[in-house]
């Protein structure tokens, strides 16, 4: 199976071309065809010799993904189900915001983090995506814009889809360098957010990278007892270890950390828990932000339901009174399979039923 050429950074593409007897500018031309003209095949690169196009075709594919399902919400949110070369399925989401077009990408097939409220973890991790497969998600959404011919572009990226990004650290970092490259898609680092469930040692590594990319942490509970029950990762990286890494990140980068907090009715949304959360983030208040997220129910996790509006507002009020920077997140795609992993899970179930029916 040939790798996608999207898996190479610009420097890696230059080195690859030079090793094959080409001048550096040839790699620059290829890069422009890929990320500025956004061609879908090497044959469209009209200023590249046929011999070198043949070498490119022997070595790489362009976009390795195949579109299986597209769902569009009334609010303009678009959810894509893509098929990988090995037949596995991943999800990507386009969200139209007032500040631009944001794309949520997937980094793994399945997830091993084991959050008890999440659709992504219903299917265990089967493999990591390589950087080309992650970049390809952005490229296909951008193709959707290009085909519309309205001058739209992917302006923001959130690495919050299926999988734990820091469990696929090397490929995610390569992806970030590709989409941030000023000579390509040029998506600003401050318009990119990577979300982790709390792999403390990788947060420290990320701090040392020197990138301006935003960091979000999926917190979802204000104490170890509850967090260990609803997020298995907390057993390996309890809050003390996690917050030590977060403090290191803030000290090293002077950048704000966003805490994601899904509101689960009568599980993590009490006044007492709001005060616990305020106390937990007290020492990093100036460089932290809490995002209160309405829960998208998952049929397989029927022990959870969405917090009632009055409980969310009461929780929010406690945080604000304690000086916590916070917001209740705007919902997107509520009329489609909005929760991360839902569309993939449903499609896989249908595929299995079709196979069973033909036997």
Curated annotation (Swiss-Prot):
Q: Give Gene Ontology CC terms.
A: cytoplasm
- Tell me the compartments it is located in: Cytoplasm
> Could you tell me what reaction this enzyme catalyses?
adenosine(2503) in 23S rRNA + 2 reduced [2Fe-2S]-[ferredoxin] + 2 S-adenosyl-L-methionine = 2-methyladenosine(2503) in 23S rRNA + 5'-deoxyadenosine + L-methionine + 2 oxidized [2Fe-2S]-[ferredoxin] + S-adenosyl-L-homocysteine; adenosine(37) in tRNA + 2 reduced [2Fe-2S]-[ferredoxin] + 2 S-adenosyl-L-methionine = 2-methyladenosine(37) in tRNA + 5'-deoxyadenosine + L-methionine + 2 oxidized [2Fe-2S]-[ferredoxin] + S-adenosyl-L-homocysteine
Name of a matching Pfam family: RlmN_N
What cofactor does its activity depend on?
[4Fe-4S] cluster
- Molecular function terms in GO for this entry? 4 iron, 4 sulfur cluster binding; metal ion binding; rRNA (adenine(2503)-C2-)-methyltransferase activity; rRNA binding; tRNA (adenine(37)-C2)-methyltransferase activity; tRNA binding
| EC number, UniProt record | 2.1.1.192
Question: What's the superkingdom here?
Answer: Bacteria
Q: How is the cofactor bound?
A: Binds 1 [4Fe-4S] cluster. The cluster is coordinated with 3 cysteines and an exchangeable S-adenosyl-L-methionine.
The entry's family comment says:
Belongs to the radical SAM superfamily. RlmN family.
**Mind telling me which HAMAP family this protein's record contains?**
RNA_methyltr_RlmN
PANTHER family linked: 23S RRNA METHYLTRANSFERASE, RADICAL SAM CORE DOMAIN-CONTAINING PROTEIN
Q: Which NCBIfam families match?
A: rRNA_mod_RlmN
Could you identify this protein by its name? Answer: Probable dual-specificity RNA methyltransferase RlmN
What species does this protein belong to?
A: Streptococcus pyogenes serotype M12 (strain MGAS2096)
User: Upper lineage ranks?
Assistant: Bacteria, Bacillati, Bacillota, Bacilli, Lactobacillales
């Amino acid at each position: 199976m040939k790798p996608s050429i999207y898996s190479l950074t610009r420097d890696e593409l230059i080195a690859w071309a030079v090793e094959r007897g080409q001048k550096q500018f040839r790699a620059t031309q290829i890069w422009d065809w890929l990320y500025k003209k956004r061609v879908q095949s090497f044959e469209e690169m009209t200023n590249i010799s046929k011999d070198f196009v043949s070498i490119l075709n022997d070595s790489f594919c362009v976009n390795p993904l195949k579109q299986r399902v597209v769902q569009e919400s009334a609010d303009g949110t678009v959810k894509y189900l893509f098929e990988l070369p090995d037949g596995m399925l991943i999800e990507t989401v386009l969200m139209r915001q007032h500040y631009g077009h944001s794309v949520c990408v997937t980094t793994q097939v399945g997830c091993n983090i084991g959050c008890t409220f999440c659709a992504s973890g219903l299917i265990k991790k089967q493999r990591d995506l390589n950087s080309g497969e992650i970049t390809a998600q952005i490229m296909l959404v951008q193709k959707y814009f290009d085909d519309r011919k309205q001058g739209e572009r992917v302006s923001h990226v959130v690495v919050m889809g299926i999988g734990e990004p820091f469990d696929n650290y090397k490929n995610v970092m390569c992806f970030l360098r590709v989409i941030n490259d000023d000579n390509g898609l040029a998506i600003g680092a401050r318009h990119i957010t990577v979300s982790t469930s709390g792999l403390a040692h990788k947060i420290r590594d990320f701090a040392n990278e020197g990138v301006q990319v935003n960091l979000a942490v999926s917190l979802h509970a204000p104490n170890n007892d509850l967090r260990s029950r609803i997020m298995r990762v907390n057993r390996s990286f309890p809050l003390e270890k996690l917050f030590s890494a977060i403090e290191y990140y803030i000290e090293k980068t002077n950048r704000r950390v966003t805490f994601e907090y899904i509101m689960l009715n009568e599980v993590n949304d009490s006044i007492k828990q709001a005060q616990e959360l305020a106390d937990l983030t007290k020492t990093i208040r100036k460089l932290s932000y809490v995002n209160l997220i309405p829960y998208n129910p998952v049929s397989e996790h029927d022990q959870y339901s969405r917090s009632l509006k009055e409980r969310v507002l009461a929780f929010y009020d406690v945080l604000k009174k304690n000086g916590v920077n916070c917001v209740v997140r705007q919902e997107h795609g509520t009329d489609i399979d909005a929760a991360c992993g839902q569309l993939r899970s449903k499609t896989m179930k249908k595929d299995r039923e079709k196979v069973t029916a033909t036997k």
